[in-house]
Amino acid sequence: MTDFTLTKDADGIATITWDVVGKSMNVLSLEGWDDLDGCVTDALGDDAVKGIVITSGKDTFAGGMDLNVIAKMKAMSGDDPAAGLMDGLMKSHAILRKIERANLDPKTNKGGKPVACVLPGTALGIGFEIPLACHRIF
């Protein structure tokens, strides 16, 4: 099961819903980053999609990053944990930047797709960074 799901409606709105199964509040894992990246890439690449909404399937938006993520990044990096952590942070930054730019033309800053975040409640840590990367927060 994925932490983020993508649905598209007939009006051209793609909705990315964050709903971590088995948790009372959404927390971001490494797998969750991959899910979010895949959903955003899919929505941005679909010409039928005119806009993107990111929201939560829970009463709150997010409690932040799963604290085990840092330990996983260190473990995956082998002999150079600092490089592993930096790689993880840069991957996170790239995904947030993808949301922020949303296919804008890099020379003219025109085009692209609007991305809105609908917060049903609390947004902490990375759960606040994601909405900040969006164009509007509701």
Model-found features: residue ranges?
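Glycine-rich beta-to-alpha active-site loop
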Residues: 99-138
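Short coil/turn segments at beta-strand junctions that form active-site/ligand-binding loops
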Residues: 48-50, 86, 113
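Short, histidine-centered active-site or binding-site loop motifs used for metal coordination
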Residues: 17-22, 74, 114, 119
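Conserved CoA-thioester-binding segment of acyl-CoA-metabolizing enzymes
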Residues: 1-55, 79
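Glycine- (often His-adjacent) and acidic-residue-rich active-site loop
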Residues: 56-95, 123
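Residues that form or flank phosphate/diphosphate-binding pockets in enzymes
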Residues: 27, 62, 126
